[in-house]
Amino acid sequence: MEVPAAWKKFRYRGKTLEELLEMPLDDFIELLPARQRRSLKRGFNDAQRRLLEKVLKARKEMEKGKKVKIRTHVRDMVILPIMVGLTIEVYNGKEFVPVKIVPEMIGHYLGEFSHTTAVVKHGEPGLKATRSSLFVAAK
């Protein structure tokens, strides 16, 4: 009998979330795909470092039972195991989109979950909507 997906325990490259949280960053980096591994091996820039400090502070506040809102423009930050459980608001160029971090997001970039473009929904063409509508008979 196959176990339903909801019952399966999350694993990232064979490691449980608890193992990932205890693991040093250098060991975790080796589990990532090449693009993310290269990005993290080059180190964190100032904006990413500030975001990590906010995440660590928010984790401490969560343990006390408080809810902390983190807002960031840093879309190129790789999601780390320490971020799981937090809600980070990521800027998409117009507004901050709340992103609830779940274990399945580990190894992806924050920007992947805050889309910058929306599907354009055009209205009905009417009089003076386009140049060619000048020749449409008025109702």
From Swiss-Prot:
It comes from the Archaea. One of its GO terms (cellular component) is cytosolic small ribosomal subunit. InterPro entries: Ribosomal_uS19, Ribosomal_uS19_CS, Ribosomal_uS19_euk/arc, Ribosomal_uS19_SF. One of its GO terms (biological process) is translation. Keywords: Ribonucleoprotein, Ribosomal protein, RNA-binding, rRNA-binding. GO terms for molecular function: rRNA binding; structural constituent of ribosome. The keyword Lyase does not apply. Pfam families: Ribosomal_S19. Protein S19 forms a complex with S13 that binds strongly to the 16S ribosomal RNA. Belongs to the universal ribosomal protein uS19 family. HAMAP family: Ribosomal_uS19. This is Small ribosomal subunit protein uS19. It comes from Ignicoccus hospitalis (strain KIN4/I / DSM 18386 / JCM 14125).
